[in-house]
């Protein structure tokens, strides 16, 4: 975990940033609540207006604290440790029966994490900060001090909303009472700091919040976006190398990270298996705007496990209400976690319990993606699994060692 002594010795810088955030927040409280709220507004203007300021800032800071604690308490979402997949259909009870579809490398091997000795779920990522594979890993938030994943993503969004509201209130009060401060003789220097800090953080948090609203709407992660951008940079670099007339100052001296954006799925085809290629920007997990938002709020941020009747317009409207209003989302989030636990325990009594557990924790792909796979299979636009001719059953997984952060 992030509070392990040996981890803190090597990563104390990551702990210093949240501490600095708390210290800056403490100063901002002094500046806005005392220097502005009390000395200027309460004493020289209106008791009621000052009390409203204190109540609003107190409420949104309580929201910050609650969601900050919940982000740590709930965690980003831990992937179970899965044994290898039974690629050769040996009916080994210790292996996961072959799924109809799983994400793989170019040869058809499922991704295997050597750090956790487990098969990797799609979009999971091993984080050294917590010591396990995070389901639907998004990013490590240096300001909060915790990885953001499937389980604490909604709390992260609410945390940003609270911080944004805090700075908007600060900016409004500063703009309203700056003239009164000048009329007192000389502007309080705390106003300058408050203007700079609130303006800067409103822009920063507002842009970040807008980006993540887009991610929710299309069911993407920050890691997906990074991969797409790396692919664009790599393609620009390749095009620049092919163009001899391009000025030297426009050419990148150091080659970027090689990222083609090509991904692969291993699918059941007739009596065998097929490896189908796709690209990262095809968004296989995007279930549509309505379903994505309902899943975030009412389905534990999973993209499956509910019937079509669950995704009504009324429930979409309710999801927006729960998303906007602080604190009322908390019971729904914990209910979503309990639902995952119930689904696993219910399925584990069946014969293929490992496959059932693997399916519950995995994400499903959308119909558009499945249609794309079917079209490629019909056109014979696929390849045979490399492990059927190149490997032995003792070496049947693709090992990933470089995915740790």
From Swiss-Prot:
GO BP, one annotated term: protein targeting to membrane
One Gene Ontology term of the molecular function aspect: protein-cysteine S-palmitoyltransferase activity
Protein origin, superkingdom: Eukaryota
Record-level GO cellular component terms: endoplasmic reticulum; Golgi apparatus; membrane
Membrane topology recorded in Swiss-Prot or TrEMBL: Multi-pass membrane protein
Its EC number(s): 2.3.1.225
Family: Belongs to the DHHC palmitoyltransferase family. PFA5 subfamily.
Record's comment describing the protein's domains: The DHHC domain is required for palmitoyltransferase activity.
Protein name per the record: Palmitoyltransferase PFA5
Organism: Candida albicans (strain SC5314 / ATCC MYA-2876)
Lineage per the UniProt record: Eukaryota, Fungi, Dikarya, Ascomycota, Saccharomycotina
